[in-house]
């Protein structure tokens, strides 16, 4: 690809997560693209907007996020968008509805309901762990379960756990908003037209939450570039942030 350094980025997290969950990855990304402007957006019902209701469909989430980006002045030039899981569904909708906004899109560990069956979009092996989150009220226990489910290499990292516990204590995502996001993800069926901008897919072959076959299905449908990490979990930037930024540099520069 052409050299796209000096550009602006928008980053989107996934289900029931907020922008602070990017953690140290932001430092890693900035180190690789030192001249770039990196901007983080919170999905409705998360982060700074935790007291607001989340829509139950990807289209509405997309429109609210775009309004947020416009308000902050992030869209006066096309952006590189980097998104994980649910956030990647929003990114896909964004580039289809507003192609003038997006220069490139990198989508990590995501899935679409019209391309992959439900038992791949949420791996059946994780059902018990996933359901236990719904009945866990203790914040530390809940965040520990999420970390165990989404990370393969840092599942016992007490520093990460403390950070996540603090985030949830300060800006808790409600059970209702979590359900709304689950509904949005479960029902999302993108249009079948080819993406209007360059797209890179990244997935984790050992993702225990979403099957890597889901990214493969997206790759096959539109003949997109897919790069796979052999051992990381669902939270790819947590487990392999250095690998992610290397792929971005190789692809963009």
Question: Which residues are covered by each model-predicted region?
Answer:
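Gly/Ala-rich beta-loop-alpha elbow adjacent to hydrolase catalytic centers
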Residues: 83-87, 91
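Conserved HGGG/HGGXW glycine-rich cap/lid loop of the alpha/beta-hydrolase fold
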Residues: 2-51
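Conserved alpha/beta-hydrolase catalytic His-Asp/Glu region
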Residues: 138-192
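Flexible "cap/lid" loop of the alpha/beta hydrolase fold
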Residues: 96, 102-134
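Conserved alpha/beta-hydrolase "acid-adjacent" motif
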Residues: 208-214
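Catalytic histidine-centered segment of alpha/beta-hydrolase-like enzymes
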Residues: 232-245
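Short beta-strand/loop motif that positions the catalytic acidic residue
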Residues: 195, 201-203, 207
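Active-site loop/oxyanion-hole signature of alpha/beta-hydrolase fold enzymes
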Residues: 37-80
């Amino acid at each position: 690809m052409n050299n796209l350094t000096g550009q602006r980025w928008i980053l989107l997290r996934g289900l029931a997560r907020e922008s602070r969950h990017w953690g140290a990855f932001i430092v890693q990304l900035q180190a690789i693209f030192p001249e770039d402007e990196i901007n983080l957006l919170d999905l409705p019902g998360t982060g700074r907007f935790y007291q607001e209701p989340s829509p139950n469909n990807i289209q509405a989430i997309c429109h609210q996020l775009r309004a947020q980006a416009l308000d902050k002045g992030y869209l006066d030039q096309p952006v590189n968008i980097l998104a994980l899981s649910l956030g990647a569904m929003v990114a896909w909708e964004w580039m289809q509805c507003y192609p003038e906004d997006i220069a490139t899109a990198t989508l990590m560990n995501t899935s679409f309901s019209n391309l992959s069956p439900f038992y791949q979009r949420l791996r059946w092996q994780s059902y018990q762990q996933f359901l236990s989150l719904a009945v866990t009220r203790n914040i530390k226990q809940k965040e520990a379960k999420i970390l165990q489910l989404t990370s393969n290499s840092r599942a016992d990292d007490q520093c990460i756990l403390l950070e996540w516990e603090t985030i949830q204590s300060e800006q808790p995502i409600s059970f209702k908003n979590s359900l709304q996001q689950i509904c949005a993800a479960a029902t999302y069926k993108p249009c079948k037209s080819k993406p209007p901008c360059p797209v890179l897919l990244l997935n984790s072959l050992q993702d225990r939450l979403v099957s890597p076959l889901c990214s493969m299905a997206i790759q096959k449908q539109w003949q997109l570039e897919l790069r796979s990490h052999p051992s990381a979990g669902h939270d790819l930037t947590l487990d392999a942030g250095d690998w992610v930024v290397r792929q971005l540099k190789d692809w963009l520069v």
